[in-house]
Amino acid sequence: MISYFSYTSSWFRDVWECRLTVEEKKHGNTDLIFPTGIACAQPSVSNSRPDVSTTTPWLAPIVWEGTYDLTVIDNIYKQQNITVAVTVFALGKYVRFLKDFLESAEQHFMVGYRVHYYLFTDRPDEVPTVTLGEGRQLTVIKTETSNRWQEISLRRMERIEKLIEKELTDKADYIFSLDVDCKFYAHWGAESLGDLVGVLHAGFFGTSREHFTYERRPESQAFIPLQEGDYYYGGAVIGGRLDKVHKLVKTCRMQLDVDRANHIEAAWQEESHLNKYFLYNKPSKLLSPEYLWDDTKGKPSYLKVVRFSQVFKKYAEVRPNP
């Protein structure tokens, strides 16, 4: 099922008129109830992945192949009857990545669950026809583009914030924001669900934090001092429950507004603000680089599977400006 609506300035107004606020939304049962009569393997008491870290210092799990039992997870989450919203931005020439993104998502992303894609694009006539599975739908949101890719990046937080407030409070339980210039190569399922979910950036995995490309200028709201920082998170994947993600994108949007008023742009736009947010608001679950790899990279021994990866592209060809 595909539906369309226009994304205009009026969509930003009168947020308080929503029938339900994000904070008031009842998320339903969040208990991890396991049904009776289901046979599964006995968990091991030893570390199943000694080659990588599987927990953070604040005891959030880092999801790797071999660290979970999908039978257990699906038996817990499928009875909750959840809906997962996915925001995708395909502005300008980035619309060319849509077909591979959607077709591969239908093969691998949250298969067996209700999924609603929300596609922001300035080229609705170029949206490809993709067969969607049962319980899965696509809404196309006509959106203004920009002649600067940096501005396109900066506006995403605001657009996700308003989408949650105006459309999703009674329509979804979880939300993921995923970059369109990526492709799914393997299973991505309910093991990725959590209150607030970030992904470890493949380019900085195993790198000391003084080499992270955090925003280092104190004038920016995204500023992180050299002696601080846990991980470097990729902005191509953000997820979690609606209320948690809403708080994240609203906070980042407010910080972006302050920076804009002060005529400063963080080093990596919304990704810089995301890293600042996650430093002081720890994610409850981290996805390993399996969930955000890069097609131009080789496959190291610790990477047992590539689930989602940025595809090769010539940025000068697809971006509206250098």
Kindly label every feature range from the protein language model:
Residues 119, 176-179, 239, 286-288:
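A structural signal for short, well-ordered beta-strand segments and their strand-loop junctions
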Residues 207-222:
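E2/UBC-UEV (E2-variant) core
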Residues 157-208:
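GT-A fold catalytic core of metal-dependent nucleotide-sugar glycosyltransferases
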Residues 1-155, 163-170:
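N-terminal anchoring/stem segment of glycosyltransferases
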Residues 120-127, 182, 186, 292:
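Short, polar loop motifs at secondary-structure junctions
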Residues 220-314:
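Catalytic core and acceptor-binding pocket of nucleotide-sugar-dependent glycosyltransferases
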Residues 86, 105, 117, 160, ...:
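Structural signal for hydrophobic/aromatic residues that build the beta-strand cores
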Residues 97-99, 128-131, 186-190, 297-300:
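A short acidic (Asp/Glu
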